[in-house]
């Protein structure tokens, strides 16, 4: 885009309103679905059908405040403190193993005053920032030397071990794909991944085979109907919910499966209730919203690259990969395409930690967009000044 067009667009649209618009619709849909899917379980557990909705609204408010603060922080701050941010994440992962709250056999949450904080959500944003800084600093080496890529094995290996000890296989997988995607965008050759992914994949397969818990998840995912009232119960109920929606859904608030038939209907399996109430058309619209987020994040990243703002561009790419990958996995789990991962549907599922970190991630992307627009305007002013002289 010519500089003059860029300047005019930056003056008219000081921030990416397509991204803000898609996010606003997702938030609205998310609150609607948390309200609908949690009515029965809220009434049963707390005697208040709005309990989970009110907590989600509080988390959204907290996330918006955090996003506003992050939007005001220059990206140079994150570039300077990327290492400290990652170390804080590792320390929190150790603390959660010692002091964490165990839910459904996993120690993933640190009990705090306002919420149970899921540290793996913090690690996702910490990894994006750390990778952006590393790749910005070692861009040439990453493209030419396998050593520059394998150097990441130590910090991320420690992180992966701590995550798997919780255990949190889903977040480990998401973070691994984020790292891979950012490396590819930075120009790392494919052969580097063949040399690293194959041994890691072999190790993961061995972990699944030797763990009855993980093996049961894989078996249930492959054929949930073989045990519809036992290990396959949750997935079969999710599939029933999705199937009931047909083309146009049964209507907002009219889901049957949310009436204590489908466990975790307001968290990891909220998508199935959404599909039941909104149907295939609603699912297509939801997918379009996530693709819009991905496109806008990648567009912001590309424009940052065009201004040689590689750190900010990589953050935008990393956050885009994170949001859409997690959405795809969650939808796939609900539709029986992937084993259960324990991942939320971004901006939709109930969960304070996820909402908070996602808002911070999007705020960083908006900050990238803001600084890129400012750089374009400054460049155009310099050019006009030189022309007058």
From Swiss-Prot:
It catalyses: [GlcNAc-(1->4)-Mur2Ac(oyl-L-Ala-gamma-D-Glu-L-Lys-D-Ala-D-Ala)](n)-di-trans,octa-cis-undecaprenyl diphosphate + beta-D-GlcNAc-(1->4)-Mur2Ac(oyl-L-Ala-gamma-D-Glu-L-Lys-D-Ala-D-Ala)-di-trans,octa-cis-undecaprenyl diphosphate = [GlcNAc-(1->4)-Mur2Ac(oyl-L-Ala-gamma-D-Glu-L-Lys-D-Ala-D-Ala)](n+1)-di-trans,octa-cis-undecaprenyl diphosphate + di-trans,octa-cis-undecaprenyl diphosphate + H(+). GO terms for molecular function: lipid-linked peptidoglycan transporter activity; peptidoglycan glycosyltransferase activity. Residues 1-14, 79-84, 133-144, 190-191, 290-310, 366-389 are cytoplasmic. Disulfide bonds: none annotated. This is Probable peptidoglycan glycosyltransferase FtsW. Residues 36-57, 106-111, 166-168, 213-268, 332-344 are periplasmic. It is a multi-pass membrane protein. Keywords: Cell cycle, Cell division, Cell inner membrane, Cell membrane, Cell shape, Cell wall biogenesis/degradation, Glycosyltransferase, Membrane, Peptidoglycan synthesis, Transferase, Transmembrane, Transmembrane helix. It is an enzyme of class 2 (transferase). It comes from the Bacteria. One of its GO terms (biological process) is regulation of cell shape. The chain crosses the membrane at residues 15-35, 58-78, 85-105, 112-132, 145-165, 169-189, 192-212, 269-289, 311-331, 345-365. Pathway: Cell wall biogenesis; peptidoglycan biosynthesis. Its main location: membrane. Its EC number is 2.4.99.28. Pfam families: FTSW_RODA_SPOVE (PF01098). Peptidoglycan polymerase that is essential for cell division. Belongs to the SEDS family. FtsW subfamily. It comes from Hydrogenovibrio crunogenus (strain DSM 25203 / XCL-2). It is found in: Cell inner membrane. GO terms for cellular component: cell division site; plasma membrane.
